Every structure is written in structure tokens, then in C-alpha cells.
């Protein structure tokens, strides 16, 4: 016990006033709550309520020479502000006994002015896989330059999620699905990604962009000809409207959408086979050109001029198994696309007692891609969200300028990470 535990109330009040008046040095005196030094809960063993601290406060300046400890001010401020329930994470459960002691022994004197006594309740933290939620550890990522700031799209912060393209509705739906638990667990981030896919599938306009291009030349399409195609922003829902998409002899498609030879399960473009170009024509791959290293640099195709989508001809309704997105090379808009992956390669990077969580950083969590987009996206505004058809959902980043479009990849159309993990 403290040798001063039996000091009288009057003497304690006198010393406390001197603490307030700045008559003592820091550490010379403290005010403690007289509870129970034999309590099995260490927090109830006469905890400190106030200490002398000569620090300038950002609001009150140097008006105060004493400052309260957390456990005292926690319940005190809740009571003054008439907070009915103080919701805390599970590590604060031992603090509830002290919270209640202060309420029962001190707040009794203010019940007429403040009639509602507060209650502390605990629940488990929201822990997401492949990231960390500790503010202290997130700050280390910022200070060490691992991420660009608190709003880096890889950060599990509201500002980071917003910049990446997550909507309030998707986050709310995720939280409602997870619910409140008393048990510590790790929520698979794939659930959060499912929620944003679900939301953007209903709300995002569909457009076309090519991230990894290979050139296609339609050899029987006139060199001096250009067309403007009317393309719907959403083929499945009304009210989205449409935009003009230019079409010409030379196009870009994705490299992975072409194979010289492929099995029957490959429904994209291959030599001697047909595919439909979205909102345009059916084309057939006739030949391809390679560079000195054997990489395909150009695909020569022919098109069926009667197969134009929506033209009403018999050929336009002809069924082919594959449909590809594309952009006209002549009209394509260059853009920077930032593709994001998991920030960490370990499901629970801060759960290893013998290792620093920084050891599990994913070196490929950010890939910057020089992409080619359809020209309608030139008028896209910061924060606007789109589905790049067959690729995923993307949002216009605040780094966009009048000269350069910048998109952040919000999420792919499918959970490719889980599929990859299951194959290992």
C-alpha cells in the first residue's frame, strides 16, 4: 500500500488543488482512486486518476497543469456527454470493472444533471486477411514509404478504400454481413471484394479498355474507313444510356485473348477461328507476325461485313463462342492504370511472434500499367467508377490531370486470388 493511503480527504483536496495550481513538479504528486490493493484485477489496485503534466494542449493551451488518465476520463467523458454505451474491443474487457467502479462511486453525485449512466461493452476487432488493422503498424507503412499515404488504395482505411473505388453501400453491406462477435477471428478480404463487385455490378457503366495490347489488322476492312458504333453502357439494365465507340481497320485486343493453337476450351481468338468483337463485327484470325524473339506483334484478321451487332441481318445473329473487348488504335486514349494486389503475402502478417510483419510485404502489390481506353472515358471525373469489360472494376484517381487519365483497379471480376491460393 502507499504510505499516503490513509491521508484525510481534506488534505487530499488541498494537495489536488496545488497540483492544479502548478505548485508541484511533474512526477512529484499524483491523485489515485482508493479502491482495493488486493483485487485480482490489477486495474483496481488504486489506479492513477490525475498526474502533473506541463504540456501545451492544442485547444486549451497552458490553462491546465494536470491531465486525467485514460481509464478515468473514458467513463467521465461518456457520462458528461450522456453516452449510453461505450463500445470497445476485447482487450478493454478487464477495464470494465474500473469503468463501473468510477460510475458507481463518483457519478452518483451528478445523477440529477446527468441522469443516464454509461455502459461499457466489448466486441472483437475487425481483422481482415492479408492486411493489418493496427493504426500504429499502418503508420509505420506510411512513415517508411511502403505506401504513398493513409489514402493509399492498398490501405484498409476509409480514405484508402474510397480512393480505390469502394462505395459506402459496399462497406456497409460488408459490416452487416460480418456482424458483431465476441470471438477473435480473421475475416477473409474476399468477402469485402465480393460486396464491392455486387454493388458495382448494379451501378457501374461498362466500357472497354485494353491493358496488355496486341495489334489486330482487319485486312479486308477499307483503310480509309471509320465507323462510330452505338454501344450501351449496360446490356442488362435500363437507364444507363449509351456512348459512341469508334471502329477502324487497326485495333488493340488483349495479348492473352489470342493463341496460334489452343484446345477446344479456349473460346477466344485463334488461327482459323472466329470471335465477335463487342458491339462490332465477327472476325476470323488468318495469320500473325512475330518479332525476332518469337513474340506476336500483329494478328491479321478478316471480318464479316454483314455481322455488325444490332444491324438485324441474319449474319449479325450468328452465334460464335467468344466475345472480345477491343479499342481502335487510332482513337484510343492512353491512361495509367494502377493494379493492386494484397499488401501482404501472409494471411495474418502480424500474428507471428518471432517475425516482423514487414517481412511479409508483397513486393508486387502495385503494378503500374500503360493502358489504352475507348475515347468516351476522356470525360470521366475523379472518383467515377467503371467496369472495364472482361477485366474488372476501376475508379478514376485524384492524380488524374487534363493530360493524363489515372485509374485505380478496385477489384477483378472474379476472385482470382482464392483460385490461385487453392491451386498451390
Q: Across the structure, where does each feature detected by a protein language model lie?
A:
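Hydrophobic alpha-helix position signal
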Residues: 103-106, 141-145, 161, 175
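Basic, alpha-helical terminal appendages of large translation-related enzymes
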Residues: 7-10, 147-148, 163-173, 178-424
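Short acidic (Asp/Glu) and glycine-rich catalytic loops that position anionic groups and cofactors
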Residues: 74-83, 116-119, 137-141, 148-155, ...
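Exposed alpha-helical structural elements
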Residues: 11-15, 98, 137, 157, ...
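Active-site cores that bind ATP or allylic diphosphates and position pyrophosphate for catalysis
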Residues: 1-138, 196, 205, 210-214, ...
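Short, flexible active-site loop motifs that bind/organize anionic cofactors or intermediates
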Residues: 85, 89, 161, 182
Amino acid at each position: 500500500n502507499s504510505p499516503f493511503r490513509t491521508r484525510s480527504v481534506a488534505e487530499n483536496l488541498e494537495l489536488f488543488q496545488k497540483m492544479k495550481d502548478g505548485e508541484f513538479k511533474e512526477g512529484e504528486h499524483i491523485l489515485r482512486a482508493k479502491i482495493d490493493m488486493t483485487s485480482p484485477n490489477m486495474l483496481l489496485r488504486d489506479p492513477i486518476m490525475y498526474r502533473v503534466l506541463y504540456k501545451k494542449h492544442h485547444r486549451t493551451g497552458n490553462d491546465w497543469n494536470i491531465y486525467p488518465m485514460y481509464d478515468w476520463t473514458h467513463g467521465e467523458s461518456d457520462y458528461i456527454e450522456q453516452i449510453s454505451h461505450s463500445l470497445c474491443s476485447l482487450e478493454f474487457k478487464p477495464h470494465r470493472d474500473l469503468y463501473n467502479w468510477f460510475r458507481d462511486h463518483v457519478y452518483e453525485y451528478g445523477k440529477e444533471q446527468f441522469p443516464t449512466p454509461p455502459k461499457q461493452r466489448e466486441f472483437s476487432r475487425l481483422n481482415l486477411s492479408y492486411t493489418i488493422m493496427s493504426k500504429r503498424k499502418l503508420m509505420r507503412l506510411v512513415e517508411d514509404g511502403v505506401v504513398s499515404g493513409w489514402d493509399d488504395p492498398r490501405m484498409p482505411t476509409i480514405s484508402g478504400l474510397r480512393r480505390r473505388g469502394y462505395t459506402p453501400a459496399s462497406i456497409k453491406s460488408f459490416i452487416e454481413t460480418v456482424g458483431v462477435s465476441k470471438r477473435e477471428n480473421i475475416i477473409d478480404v474476399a468477402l469485402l471484394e465480393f460486396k464491392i463487385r455486387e454493388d458495382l455490378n448494379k451501378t457501374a457503366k461498362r466500357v472497354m479498355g485494353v491493358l496488355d495490347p496486341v495489334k489486330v489488322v482487319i485486312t479486308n476492312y477499307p483503310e480509309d474507313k471509320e465507323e462510330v458504333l452505338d454501344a450501351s453502357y449496360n446490356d442488362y439494365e435500363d437507364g444507363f444510356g449509351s456512348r459512341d465507340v469508334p471502329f477502324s481497320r487497326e485495333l488493340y485486343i488483349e495479348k492473352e485473348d489470342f493463341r496460334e493453337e489452343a484446345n477446344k476450351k479456349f473460346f477466344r481468338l485463334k488461327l482459323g477461328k472466329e470471335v465477335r468483337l463487342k458491339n462490332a463485327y465477327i472476325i476470323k484470325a488468318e495469320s500473325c507476325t512475330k518479332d525476332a524473339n518469337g513474340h506476336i506483334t500483329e494478328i491479321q484478321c478478316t471480318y464479316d461485313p454483314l455481322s455488325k451487332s444490332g444491324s438485324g441481318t441474319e449474319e449479325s445473329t450468328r452465334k460464335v463462342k467468344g466475345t472480345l473487348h477491343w479499342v481502335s488504335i487510332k482513337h484510343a486514349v492512353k491512361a495509367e492504370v494502377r493494379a493492386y494486389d494484397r499488401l501482404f503475402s501472409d494471411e495474418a502478417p502480424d500474428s507471428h511472434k518471432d517475425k516482423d510483419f514487414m517481412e511479409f510485404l508483397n513486393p508486387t502489390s502495385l503494378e503500374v500499367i500503360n493502358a489504352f481506353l475507348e475515347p468516351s472515358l476522356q470525360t470521366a471525373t475523379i472518383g467515377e467508377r467503371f467496369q472495364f469489360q472482361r477485366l474488372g472494376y476501376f475508379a478514376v484517381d485524384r492524380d488524374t490531370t487534363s493530360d493524363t487519365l489515372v485509374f485505380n483497379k478496385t477489384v477483378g471480376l472474379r476472385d482470382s486470388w482464392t483460385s490461385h491460393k487453392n491451386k498451390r
